[in-house]
Amino acid sequence: MTMQTIVNGGARRNAERGASLLELALLLPILVVLVFGVIDLGRLIHARLVVTNVSREGGSLASRDIQTGANLITMLQSSATPFNLQTQGRIYVTKIKAGTSQSAPLPYILSRDSGGSYNVSSSIGGSVGAAPTGLSTTMYNHLRFEPAPQSAADIAEISVVEVFYHYRPITPLPNFVQNLFPVNGGILIGSRAIF
């Protein structure tokens, strides 16, 4: 083996190492963004499932009057672990009573409770004692009093539970991709259950 072969072989290995470092430098940021995206997307899906389950469970409990008012909201907030619905979310529990007579045929809001410090409005409008807004036309019509021969509403009462959570990513991904999360650096997740 000559000295020329050894020198050329070493130069080739150094060139291959340099190319490998260049490939790593180009691919590493892409891999980091992908890993961060997978982590945050997984947490977002988990948060969405938790919010949906909390609203459904709350609707079920509220419709059966197992827990009411502040006790129900406290129980629902604690069931949302690991997400903090006290500071980063809001829960509304609204009971709507059907119309009861021809003189009072319209449904009305019987009670409304809420808990959590995040500033978001309920989709059910109106105050206690007033006709609710935000229900579908079909649901609203089922709550209206119907005169003879029925002389009643189709449904006597419904419970509406709305759960909102402001999801924020835990990775620095929003620093890499601008305008990824438009609402205060996060996404507002909401779910409504009617029982």
Residue map of PLM features:
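Intrinsically disordered, low-complexity regions enriched in Pro/Ser/Thr/Gly and acidic residues
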Residues: 99-187
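Mobile, glycine-rich extracellular loop/lid and propeptide segments
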Residues: 3-6, 26-30, 55
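N-terminal leader/signal peptides at the extreme start of proteins
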Residues: 1-17
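Soluble periplasmic/extracytoplasmic beta-strand elements of cell-envelope proteins
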Residues: 90-95, 160-164, 190-194
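Extracytoplasmic beta-strand-rich oligomerization domains located immediately C-terminal to a leader/signal peptide
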Residues: 65-107
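N-terminal alpha-helical signal peptides/signal-anchor transmembrane segments
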Residues: 41, 45, 54-79
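N-terminal single-pass transmembrane signal-anchor helix
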Residues: 14-43
